[in-house]
């Protein structure tokens, strides 16, 4: 029996007992049976309570392979760190902030290895009362994205309000037009109306709460009233028919064709939100609740992958220097930023300094109604 020098578990936030990992284990081994017990509760939703519990079942002692050491890799290891699974000496951090800081500080004559990595910008929007009111719930009347985009079959329960939201993001919401005319160039930049975004956000990922919501959005985008979106190929990456893993990636690239000449919108409630790379994605719209920073930032960082090409002389051209996160629940967005920046940096003890370092490289623009 082979004793390996090291076993590397990538995407550790995602668990070690998924179907792909299990296929490498001896099916007669008790560990395989233990893994099978959790399979039925693994879902598309990377943040669901049951799925998190299933992933926590993993135990090195059950691994049917012998090794001298383990290396766990994750871009969002919040639960592993907060649970005390690893002591401080076992943790090495290289975060988004470190990467962007290294990119800016690069002074060598050698090519900058970080130059391709886009800088992320977050824009949060407090929706007008006339749109938000239908989904204000709870003790503090917080805007509930899951309620707002709730759907059955392929129809939104609040379709009238979702249509208002679509009008808003493309700059044609009538209740805002007079105010925006007064503001002129100071009006909030919406993802599908601001000229700075229109040519840049050719391919976006919309993160919705359910398969039904994805199908409902696809149907709504194809209505004559939304003729603006007819230029975009809409991909529903949700449900069993969308495929799993790499099979869910192929339809997206097929729809893009030559991504510099096409436009796409990918609708998903979990597929393609972790462990995959779709280079032409330049923006993500966060359209679902998420109390888990793992789920939130795994999805957000899907749009931060580098995208380059070669010019006629063979020189590298960076096509994506920036990428964007659009969030319509400002309080939730800021809470996620606070948790991400504070939980990953175990060396710094001052939370304000942790957040300050993070937003130095991830600027956040917050819009309330028609003002920043």
PLM segments and residue spans:
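Interdomain helical connector at the RecA1-RecA2 junction of SF1/SF2 helicase-like NTPases
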Residues: 61, 65, 69, 80-203
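Short mixed-charge
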Residues: 36-60, 105-108, 182-186, 228-233, ...
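Catalytic P-loop NTPase motifs of RecA-like helicase/translocase cores
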Residues: 15-18, 79-80, 293, 306
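Conserved C-terminal RecA-like helicase domain
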Residues: 1-3, 23-24, 30, 142-268
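Non-catalytic, charged low-complexity extensions flanking SF2 helicase motor domains
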Residues: 345-372
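A short beta-strand-to-loop transition that corresponds to the Sensor-1 phosphate-sensing loop
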Residues: 11, 73-77, 210, 268-271, ...
